[in-house]
Amino acid sequence: MQKARIKLSSTQHTELDGVCDQIKAIAEKTGVDMSGPIPLPTKALKVTTRKSTDGEGSSSFDRWTMRVHKRVIDIEADERTMKHIMKVRIPDTVQIEIELRN
């Protein structure tokens, strides 16, 4: 049977966990084997910018960070389960990638 690897990433971990819970509920309802959601390391993207635009005055900086949270779910990919997963409402902040494997 084919397996599907579902990769999810988002900057909002609560919305990401909500989508993972929906996929987990679908797997339990249809009775397919599932492993995950496996949390991958959170990537912190940092940008430091100088507050003063003209270069004069004291050197003060703004530090901005954005954290990207990732999850991986492996699931058996029968047709009924995949149709249910495709109908899940995904928030705009969550990116999803589905890869089918033999």
Swiss-Prot record:
PROSITE patterns listed in its UniProt record: RIBOSOMAL_S10 (PS00361)
One GO term of the biological process aspect: translation
Entries under SMART domains matching the protein: Ribosomal_S10 (SM01403)
Region (Disordered): 32-61
One MF term in the entry's GO annotations: structural constituent of ribosome
Record GO cellular component, one term: small ribosomal subunit
Record keywords: Ribonucleoprotein, Ribosomal protein
UniProt-listed InterPro entries: Ribosomal_uS10, Ribosomal_uS10_CS, Ribosomal_uS10_dom, Ribosomal_uS10_dom_sf, Ribosomal_uS10_euk/arc
SUPFAM superfamilies membership: Ribosomal protein S10 (SSF54999)
Domain of life: Archaea
Function: Involved in the binding of tRNA to the ribosomes.
Family indicated by similarity: Belongs to the universal ribosomal protein uS10 family.
Subunit structure: Part of the 30S ribosomal subunit.
The protein's name in its UniProt record: Small ribosomal subunit protein uS10
Source organism (scientific name): Methanococcus maripaludis (strain DSM 14266 / JCM 13030 / NBRC 101832 / S2 / LL)
Organism ancestry: Archaea, Methanobacteriati, Methanobacteriota, Methanomada group, Methanococci
